Amino acid sequence: MPYNFCLPSLSCRTSCSSRPCVPPSCHSCTLPGACNIPANVSNCNWFCEGSFNGSEKETMQFLNDRLASYLEKVRQLERDNAELENLIRERSQQQEPLLCPSYQSYFKTIEELQQKILCTKSENARLVVQIDNAKLAADDFRTKYQTELSLRQLVESDINGLRRILDELTLCKSDLEAQVESLKEELLCLKSNHEQEVNTLRCQLGDRLNVEVDAAPTVDLNRVLNETRSQYEALVETNRREVEQWFTTQTEELNKQVVSSSEQLQSYQAEIIELRRTVNALEIELQAQHNLRDSLENTLTESEARYSSQLSQVQSLITNVESQLAEIRSDLERQNQEYQVLLDVRARLECEINTYRSLLESEDCNLPSNPCATTNACSKPIGPCLSNPCTSCVPPAPCTPCAPRPRCGPCNSFVR
């Protein structure tokens, strides 16, 4: 609590009617602290006989009382200063926990959350990489599937072409079989016609006479027919064997191609089924990864929102603590300023006390018994007093006595 001190100014001018007129240089001197001491206790050194009267005794008593009050006030100020120091010390001790709050738990929590966020981010990145790899694998499988599908279509087109060739060969075989049957029927017809002609000729020859003539040997028709038949049969057999051999060869080749194509088709079908299963599994896994990513993103968003709110609360707490710290610092600065003001007041009071002490010590000097031997302020001897002091101290202007004034008293008092 600040103390405002107003140093009193003592206007202690006594009436000059109680003593002889003094020269103009013997007026009252102003002391430090704005207190005017009467001329009879001043440092003018113009003392006449009987100058230390009752008013001056009252002034000295008043000064002693003021000195005692100053000393008491100094002690009171020292006690107040000690109380203020104790109060400041207690306040500082009470505010110490607020000055340095412990945020280690918050820091640990923040570090753990940061580690979790980093782990979540790394897991999210790993899942993204896995998803990208799965997409690339799916693209590869899709490309392979398209390739195998094109190969399958080519094989199916080849199989269809071979089937058409097989149908053509079957038709050709049926045509050849029909030709063989027609040739067999024609051969039978020729045989029957030949037998009929032979029988007819035999009948005709049997009715005739046997006339032997010398002529060229006749042609054996049976032999010729047999040779012709054997030639045709050999030709037909050769053609048949060639056709059968060609048909067998083509059939075997077609069978081999069909078997290989069927095997390839089965392998392709198995591979296609396996690829479909893989694609389905990858799609399911991709959907699961998408769901996991969405859940992780939601969890991350919730964690960020929750920890941002906690961080804002911690920040507000830090702001409040900083504001309290600023208030405490301002209070400490204000109390320090008040303490400095009190120290200044104490120093001024000590200076005034020293001044009053020097004045009191100067007043303790022995007063001269012979007023005519009194020296002035310049330590020069003063001539003997005349019977009429007013005539000896006549200034250039006529001397007019001072108007009577009331007894001096303190002008101001301490204001707290």
Curated annotation (Swiss-Prot):
Domain IF rod: 56-367
Region named Coil 1B: 103-203
Coiled coil recorded as keyword: yes
SUPFAM superfamilies documented for this protein: Intermediate filament protein, coiled coil region
Region (Coil 2): 220-363
Region (Coil 1A): 57-91
Site residues by UniProt (Stutter): 305
Expression (tissue specificity): Present in scalp but not in hairless skin. Abundantly expressed in the differentiating cortex of growing (anagen) hair. Expression is restricted to the keratinocytes of the hair cortex and is absent from inner root sheath and medulla.
UniProt GO MF annotations: structural constituent of cytoskeleton
Region (Linker 12): 204-219
Keywords: Coiled coil, Intermediate filament, Keratin
Note: There are two types of hair/microfibrillar keratin, I (acidic) and II (neutral to basic).
Protein name: Keratin, type I cuticular Ha1
Source organism (scientific name): Homo sapiens
The organism's taxonomic lineage, starting at the top: Eukaryota, Metazoa, Chordata, Craniata, Vertebrata
Underlying gene: KRT31
